[in-house]
């Protein structure tokens, strides 16, 4: 059974760079897991940020980038803004289904 693990919470400050990661218990995350990242704002609105590991969705600011770091998928926010405070979920593809992580609550101290 695949399990996807994320940091439960991270804190950053405006203008700082922060990296959220997504780990798989089955081994290294690769491009074949097609990592997706989704943002949930406090109003419960979900926004797709990154698809297929590193493809930014249309309209997503360039400060959001996806990559593979070591054996994990990563979402990096370069120059965080207070509006980026949200819960971030990653999802990985395993042959025939998506498995979501539990989400990372990002606090941006303003």
Swiss-Prot record:
Signal peptide feature range? none
- InterPro entries linked: Ig-like_dom, Ig-like_dom_sf, Ig-like_fold, Ig_sub, Ig_V-set, IgV_Light_Chain
CDD domains (UniProt xref): IgV_L_lambda (cd04984)
Residue ranges of domain Ig-like in the record: 1-106
One cellular component (GO) term of this entry: immunoglobulin complex
> Is this entry keyworded Oxidoreductase?
no
Has UniProt tagged this entry with the keyword Chaperone? no
Under the heading Pfam families, the entry gives:
V-set
UniProt keywords (A-Z) are: Adaptive immunity, Immunity, Immunoglobulin
Q: Which SMART domains match?
A: IG, IGv
User: In its UniProt entry, what is this protein called?
Assistant: Ig lambda-1 chain V region S178
């Amino acid at each position: 059974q695949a399990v996807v693990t994320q940091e439960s919470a991270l804190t950053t400050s405006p203008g700082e760079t922060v990296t959220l990661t997504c780990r798989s218990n089955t081994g290294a995350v690769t491009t074949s897991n097609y990592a997706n990242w989704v943002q949930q704002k406090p109003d419960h609105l979900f926004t797709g940020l990154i698809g297929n590991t590193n493809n930014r969705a249309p309209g997503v600011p360039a400060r959001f980038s996806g990559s593979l770091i070591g054996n994990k998928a990563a979402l990096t926010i370069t120059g965080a803004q207070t509006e980026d405070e949200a819960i971030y979920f990653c999802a990985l593809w395993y042959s025939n289904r998506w498995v979501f992580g539990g989400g990372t609550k990002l606090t941006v101290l303003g």
